[in-house]
Curated annotation (Swiss-Prot):
Family (UniProt): Belongs to the UPF0398 family.
Domain of life: Bacteria
Protein's name according to its UniProt entry: UPF0398 protein MGAS2096_Spy1375
Pfam family, one: YpsA
Family matches, as PANTHER family: UPF0398 PROTEIN SPR0331, UPF0398 PROTEIN YPSA
TM ranges: none
Length: 171
């Protein structure tokens, strides 16, 4: 079994507030290309954390690819309360994350800040690599996960950056 964590920018972090934004289709094209590459190299599990934005779009692409490839999808939420306060539109997205092959909640609810690092350590230990939409020019809290991932020997990171997206949009 080979598992890849998929995570990246949330929609609000990159200023995308509408699913019909033309940037979403470019991002999804890149996701499709990269996920097919993973599948053709033997990856059989895609792991998500249940966030809106990049993960949401990658989940949509992964579900489409299930028709062509034998793959499994998991969502490992940080807390059982993840998304409880989301609006109705976002609740529909949350239900898609819960309708995958495997769902786990790492903690019942928030108690202390160390839960975040414990969660990321668990994700790193349970996956062989990560596909991350992230650019050092636009830092978020993902920088802490990436630092841990880069410190792990043999952990494979594939970054989708703004430069890669620009190259794709021009070709």
């Amino acid at each position: 079994m080979t598992a890849i964590l998929i995570t990246g920018y949330r929609s609000f972090e990159i200023g995308i507030f509408d699913h019909k934004d033309p940037r979403v289709s470019i991002i999804k094209q890149a996701i499709r290309k990269d996920l097919i590459g993973y599948l053709e190299n033997g990856v059989d599990w895609f792991i998500f954390t249940g966030n809106l934005g990049f993960e949401q779009w990658a989940l949509e692409v992964a579900n489409e690819l299930k028709e062509e490839y034998p793959l499994q999808i998991a969502t490992i939420f940080l807390f059982e309360t993840h998304g409880d306060r989301w609006n109705e539109k976002n609740q529909k997205v949350l239900s898609q994350f819960r309708a995958v092959d495997f769902v786990k909640y790492y903690f019942p609810n928030y108690e202390q800040p160390t839960q975040f690092s414990q969660y990321y350590q668990f994700l790193l230990e349970k996956t062989e690599g990560a596909y991350v939409f992230y650019d050092t020019e636009n830092e978020t809290n993902l920088k802490y996960f990436l630092k841990k991932a880069k410190d792990m020997p043999h952990y494979q990171l594939l970054l989708l950056t703004f430069d890669r997206l620009n190259d794709m949009s021009q070709s």
